Amino acid sequence: MSSKLHRLVANLAGVALAVQAVPVVAQGVTGGNSGPGIGSGAGAAGSRDLTSAGGPTFADIADLSESAGLVVKAQIRKMVRVEDERAPGLAQGMARFYMTAQTQALIAGKAPIGESFVYLVDLPLDAKGKVPKLKKQDVLLFARAVPGRPGELQLVTPTAQQLWSEQAEARVRGILQSLLSGNAPVKITGVRELMYVPGNLAGQGETQIFLNTKDGSAASITVHHEPGAAPAWGVSFSELVADIGNPPRPETVEWYRLACFLPNNPPQGTNVAEGIEERRQAAADYRMVLGELGECRRTLGQGARTQG
């Protein structure tokens, strides 16, 4: 490696390694645990595309999309392995690479980007210790611009490089469109309070679950009980009444906001129902909602639902 390239790699390494110092929770992933190194862990960068079996899930892609200032389709033109001693924090079985890529398309973002750029990424070695062959491969990068360093990008998480395919790009574009639409649901940050109020008839009543949001706007879940019928519930991301009986469909942004960011248990003191039985019913309704939402599955190691 030339002395000039040594200096470039050293400078860029300092920028890219800043990713490790930023917990993923600060990038909008509740309960997330950052990976041990750039590009490490299941689904490591460049090992699979966004539609392969066992690959990134809806939640993974939504996490990356919300963290990224730029989503870029690029073709890798050059890979230079960084010596391990110049790659602090490198996980075992990984290698750090100085990548040169040619821009194919700017899928999302407003920051200017040139015809080519450089970035750092960690990639898994195979069983024989061989490096992956990604030259001329198209990839999707979830990144941010580096202030004062035109021509450099910084991946937003360790797994923010993924192999490109037409299906993968279409999936990313669909999720981005939902996240960026004018009526996209606000980010949920927790549970403010919940209460069950019984009705006039035995078995009749309603649980209201009021949610905290990032921008302080209204959001709530309503669970309605009628005698002889299964509980019905819905969510409202505004001051309007919840659409009872029409809960969010899986793999929608509404579902993502709830399934991936509601805690497993409401925080202590948030259940404000008047009596013991009412508090038990409110807690049971909360568990029912979580059960119907199902698991927020992630394969990129970026977090899970938190404990209350």
Region roles according to the model:
Residues A13-L17:
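Hydrophobic helical h-region of N-terminal Sec-dependent signal peptides
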Residues S2-L12:
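Bacterial N-terminal signal peptides that target proteins for export
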Residues S2, V25-G308:
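Transition segments tied to proteolytic processing and entry into folded domains
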